[in-house]
Curated annotation (Swiss-Prot):
HAMAP family: ProA (MF_00412). Keywords: Amino-acid biosynthesis, Cytoplasm, NADP, Oxidoreductase, Proline biosynthesis. This is Gamma-glutamyl phosphate reductase. Pathway: Amino-acid biosynthesis; L-proline biosynthesis; L-glutamate 5-semialdehyde from L-glutamate: step 2/2. InterPro entries: Ald_DH/histidinol_DH, Ald_DH_C, Ald_DH_N, Aldehyde_DH_dom, G-glutamylP_reductase_CS, Glu-5-SA_DH, GPR_dom. It is found in: Cytoplasm. One of its GO terms (molecular function) is NADP binding. GO terms for biological process: L-proline biosynthetic process. It comes from the Bacteria. The keyword Mitochondrion does not apply. Coiled coil: none annotated.
Length: 417
């Protein structure tokens, strides 16, 4: 058997036992894990330091290194996320619908685990813990394949998960880490249809596209955030500038950070001037990649290429497009959007409603930063990712997104005539 086949076989077996765990047992194990991760802080930080040092040696940008870096506060935040998942209602066994039909059959539709989840993700080691917590709470086994940049951190965290399961008398193969980070093994995982029920990629555009093209397993697409903010002619310009600065600069390396700015021509001159002024006042610097009209209105800008409008920069860079109309803004955003999060800043209620209806994205904001697209903020607890597709799940994916449904039919000897 190949390496992936062994992991898959182990996961399939483990999925049968975890599916039968009671809510109380799952919650107790999750709380044990949270305590154990905090207790293992020094070990985890030591291993994370190896990843960070390697990343710096490889010339990875400081913004991307920050995604990788752990500290005591971030480890405590990881533990807090596990506690929050433990406190959430368990969807497994929930009756979605139920009725007795004309034949006297009692038909229930219940929530059940998906089975075995595989996840391929990049950089941030906290993702491994979030993914396990949600998968475990919903009675699933999970195979984690992180990037080579975080292999030492992920190994330390998964070892803690497996030890917690073993110490509580449960199969440690409920969670497994693919320790071989080669592309060959990753592609083998994408073909493991005999063992894996769903594959969730979480990372950059290249990773997502590779998984979509090569996976034979059903895929839930997540992550890529070419996010826009449209400043309407009826916007409060001061509020608009504050929102843009927050959405672009608070944490530019995450998928809900804004990447594109679309501005109505009627207020472009005043707004762009005010935006640059407020950026200077807040000691922030953003490189604007602008169209011809915006280029004449901005001090710190370069001419945009066509590819810039479709790029998730994950940096202090932002494309800028000036539009002649509200309708053109919607058309522009729908052309370049990755269907993650989009926003309009306006005091025109009618336009706000039309924008939310017509823009094709999982989350559409009016007068708020796109940085709020997050499982915790939406009340889901930790998220396994933000789905940008329409089937099965869309937007931040919490517990319910990791379940399926099953019909339970009970009779008293009925036969079909």
């Amino acid at each position: 058997m190949t390496y992936i086949e062994i992991l898959g076989q182990n996961a399939k077996k483990a999925s049968q036992s975890v599916a039968r765990l009671s809510t109380a047992s799952k919650n107790e194990i999750l709380r044990d894990l949270a305590r154990n991760i905090v207790a293992d802080t020094e070990t985890i930080l030591t291993e994370n330091a190896r990843d960070v040092a390697k990343a710096k040696d490889n010339g990875i940008s400081e913004i991307m290194v920050d995604r990788l870096r752990l500290n005591k506060d971030r480890i405590q935040a990881i533990a807090n996320g596990i506690y929050q998942v433990a406190d959430l209602a368990d969807p497994i066994g929930q009756v979605v619908s139920g009725y007795t039909n004309l034949d006297g059959l009692k038909i229930l539709k219940k929530r059940v685990p998906l089975g075995v989840i595989a996840m391929i993700f990049e950089s941030r080691p906290n993702v491994s813990v979030d993914a396990f917590s949600l998968a475990f709470k919903t009675g699933n086994a999970i195979i984690l394949r992180g990037g080579k940049d975080a292999i030492f951190s992920n190994t330390a965290l998964v070892n803690c998960m497996r030890q917690t399961l073993q110490d509580t008398g449960h199969n440690p193969d409920i969670v497994q880490l693919v320790e071989d980070t080669s592309h060959v093994v990753a592609e083998e995982l994408m073909q493991a249809t005999d063992y894996v029920d769903v594959l969730i990629p979480r990372g950059g555009a290249k990773l997502i596209q590779t998984v979509k093209e090569k996976s034979k397993i059903p895929v839930i697409e997540t992550g890529v955030g070419n996010v826009h903010i449209y400043i309407d002619e009826f916007a409060d310009l001061d509020m608009a500038a504050k929102i843009v600065i927050n959405a672009k600069t608070q944490r530019p390396s995450v998928c809900n950070a804004a990447e594109g700015l679309v501005v109505h021509q009627a207020i472009a001159k005043g707004f762009l001037s005010q935006l640059e002024k407020m950026l200077k006042e807040s000691n922030q610097s953003v490189e604007f990649r602008a169209d011809e009209e915006a280029l004449q209105l901005l001090e710190n800008a370069v001419a945009a290429s066509e590819s810039d409008y479709a790029t998730e920069f994950l940096d202090y860079i932002m494309s800028v497009k000036v539009v002649d109309s509200f309708e053109q803004a919607i058309s522009w955003i729908n052309k370049y959007s990755s269907h993650h999060s989009e926003a309009i800043i306006t005091n025109n209620i009618s336009r706000a409603e039309i924008f939310q209806d017509m823009v094709d994205a999982a989350a559409v904001y009016v007068n708020a930063s796109t940085r709020f697209t997050d499982g915790f903020v939406f009340g889901l607890g930790a998220e396994i990712g933000i789905s940008t597709q329409k089937l099965h799940a869309r937007g931040p994916m919490g517990l319910e997104a990791l379940t399926s449904t099953k019909y339970y039919i009970n009779g008293t000897g009925q036969v079909r005539e």
